[in-house]
């Protein structure tokens, strides 16, 4: 729901700038993360297409393709485990299959070791080949909406449409996604969902093979990609210094000043000015700072959640023990315990 509400915000902004809906709606695309709840993920993509068409119809498009939802998908990084990581091959495969059957236009498959480090050539090859054999060997991409007509998938799609539309309406009541973000509501809702999920895992209500279920007694270390962060940082600094030494810095400053002036006055095409600055070899950081001089940098509103984890967890005795220990610590030390996360 929030992703589509983002899209709605872009649509309104484009129209307010004088663009015709058919001139830019077909060029919008979305990015979905694919989880391991297979049928849910297929239904999610089907529901997204229905809702996006419903949203765009309100703006009176003349072209059917304006109502088509184009999407890139990436398998979940959240579902990957550092423990017994070869299980991640199966997880990623199922998530990729859900994306394919949900008709993604493009796909990124995560490598098995990405919960630990950047992928090696070995793990990256397995990740790449996973989507290649789904595409080329299974032929599932040759069928349009293969789950259409399934009672379960259709019912799940309908349920997701209703629930996601409720989230969109909640955002609309706040004045749109930009204003909703300022209130911190979407962030809070996402954190609530994450806390509920973590509680189910920690309490054993949700099994994660190799993590809280069917763990290995002894786990052999796997080869991972070692990166010297200090060397990378020094190399990047050297590249920037070389760039600044060989460019026309007067031209760069003129471009950056033009960006700042555009933000101040609201006149001119900011994207065009940023492209011009990049052509003059201004860095991304310099371009961002030229904007930040006027409008500052966004700081998320922090709205803490409470009671979500304990309500979802079945291990209430353990939670009560922690509360008791915390109270005893406070009496003894005069303060609540601090936890570094």
Give the residues covered by each predicted segment.
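Append "with occasional cross-activation on large, charged helical scaffolds in nucleic-acid assemblies
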Residues: 80-82, 105, 178, 185
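Helix-rich catalytic cores of soluble enzyme domains
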Residues: 1-98, 111-128
